[in-house]
C-alpha cells in the first residue's frame, strides 16, 4: 500500500532534504539557501522536542518518527516485506526515473539527481548502511 511505501522512504528522504549543503540547481533560483533542516527542527520543537541546535532536534524528530513506525508495526526495510532482491534491482532504474519525473518532485525542498533517488531507494530496501558492494558498484558504473 501507498502509505507503507511512503513510510519506508520517509526517514531517508527527510535526511536527504536536511543536508546543509545540497547541490544548488540553477533552474530553481528560489532556493537561495538551504533552510530545510531549520524547518524540520521547527516541526520537532512544535511537538515538544528540544536540543542544543537544529541538528539535534532533527535527529530526535527522526527517532520519534521511527518509534511511531515501530508502534504501528511498519517494518524497517522494503526487503523485510518480502520484495525479491533480484526483482527490486531489475526495476530500480525504472522506479528511479518515475520518481524523478513525478510531478511532486519539483516541489521537494531539495531537487534530487537521479543517482540520489536511486541511493534513497537502496537505503529503503537494504537499510541505512547495509547496501551491498554490488549495489554500490552498479550505481557508480551507471553514473559515468
PLM regions: where:
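Gly/Pro-rich interdomain helix-loop hinge
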Residues: 3-90, 130-131
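Proteins with a high burden of low-complexity, intrinsically disordered sequence enriched in S/T/G/P/A and R
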Residues: 1, 78, 136-139
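Short, amphipathic C-terminal "tail helix"
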Residues: 87-144
